[in-house]
A protein has these predicted regions:
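Glycine-rich phosphate/pyrophosphate-binding loops
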Residues: 146-159, 257-275
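Secondary-shell segments that build the walls of catalytic and ion/ligand-binding clefts
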Residues: 208-268
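A generic, well-ordered mixed alpha/beta core segment in the N-terminal half of proteins
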Residues: 91-182
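Active-site cofactor/substrate anionic-group-binding motifs, chiefly glycine-
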Residues: 58-112
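Phosphate/diphosphate-binding glycine-rich loops and adjacent basic-rich segments that engage nucleotide
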Residues: 158-230
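Acidic, glycine/proline-rich low-complexity segments that act as flexible tails and inter-domain linkers
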Residues: 3-18, 24, 28-43, 48, ...
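Catalytic-core signal marking the mid-to-C-terminal active-site face
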Residues: 2-5, 9-25, 258, 269-359
């Protein structure tokens, strides 16, 4: 079936697939696992968007784990979030461990609707499941002319040590922002740690090193060896800034914990419920503030100023956050998505189990 998958990708190599074919493939697996069709479609679209943007650990690489969670009943197949608190421009939801990408998309849409009426809209979700690549939501908001902020933490996992410590307290605690401009949006997608659990696990399994000393062993020695995270006692991910300036990442992690678990009222102070997420989604309509035109003028000036900044030696040109991802998004939309070589082999057993045709 691989040839069929490549019909929309002229001259695509054998390891590239049309994005729409991948979305349908992922949706089919989820539906056959019992997920409601509209939920499955949203989850599939977000995962493929992650790969389109180049976030290969947070795209279809997550699908085998999601299917495992569904099979175990720790990610629900059907249902709806409950609104447990609300005001004119803010709501708190209980996600009931429904698929995170679907919940996050619903939260983004609701936040944008609130922003259209109130200027800002904020949705906080407790007990969501994992929400995949945060930049995908930021892009969707920015494409609609909305500034979006998305924060996420997983209260059931701890792999990042506070600055000055060797024992873990946090997850990488990612944050994303989508900022519209008259050209491509600025897409910020970073975490409070130097690297992520997904990347370190992938490199460890492949017997490879990290690009830099982004983790520390249990004695507090910085290293590029992801294996220290799987040793006994385990090491930890270093906060953003590393051993020298990790107080910055530490502070950012605390902020994200406050904006997710703190505002949601459910987090690390409670018994762990398994892999999941506590989520903060905020939408801001520039028209409510200085006006959309003025916002665009300021952001366009900033884009031009950054692009026009003199590069330091060894740098060809200055780029903006998300610039590479947007270029990759367009290129892969046109020519096919290049999947990481571990993804399809990991999905093959699920195709067999669920009676789906492998691409």
């Amino acid at each position: 079936m691989r040839a069929t998958a490549r019909l929309d990708c002229v001259n695509a190599p054998a390891d590239q697939y049309a994005a729409d074919i991948l979305v349908d493939f992922a949706r089919t697996l989820l539906v056959r696992a019992g997920v409601r069709d509209d939920i499955a479609g949203d989850v599939a679209a977000i995962l493929v968007d992650g790969d389109l943007l180049g976030h290969t650990t947070h795209g279809l690489a997550l699908l085998p784990a999601y299917l495992g969670e569904i099979e175990r009943g720790t990610m629900l197949r059907d249902g709806a979030p409950a609104v447990i608190n609300s005001r004119a421009s803010a709501e708190t939801w209980d996600g009931h461990r429904l698929p995170g990408p679907w919940l996050a998309l619903r939260a983004l849409d609701r936040a944008i609707d609130l922003a259209a009426d109130q200027g800002t809209g904020t949705i906080v979700i407790r007990r969501s499941h994992h929400i995949a690549c945060l930049a995908t939501y930021a892009k969707r908001a920015a494409d609609r002319g909305i500034v979006a902020l998305i924060y996420c933490s997983d209260p059931s996992v701890c792999s990042v040590a506070p600055f000055g410590a060797v024992s873990p307290v946090f997850t990488p605690n990612p944050l994303a922002a989508g900022i519209p401009t008259s050209r491509d949006p600025i897409l910020i997608d970073i975490s409070a740690s130097l690297t992520t659990n997904g990347l370190t696990a992938r490199l460890y399994k492949a017997g490879q090193k990290l690009p830099h000393a982004w983790v520390q062993d249990a004695q507090g020695n910085a290293t590029d060896d992801p294996g220290v995270l799987f040793a006994e006692p385990p090491g930890t991910l270093l906060p953003l800034g590393g051993l020298d300036a990790g107080h910055k990442g530490y502070a950012l992690a605390l902020l994200i914990e406050a904006m997710t678990a703190g505002l949601a009222g459910v987090g690390r102070a409670d018994p762990a419920e398994g892999w999941g997420a506590t989520v903060f989604v905020q939408a801001l309509d520039p028209q409510t503030f200085g006006g959309a035109a003025a916002f665009g003028r300021q952001m366009d000036w900033l884009v031009d100023a950054c692009h026009g900044a003199t590069p330091r030696p060894g740098v060809d040109r200055v780029r903006l956050p998300g610039e590479h991802g947007m270029a990759r998004f367009r290129e892969q939309r046109a020519n096919g998505v290049r999947l990481h070589p571990t993804i399809m082999p990991a999905l093959a057993p699920w195709c067999e189990k669920l009676g789906a045709t492998m691409l």
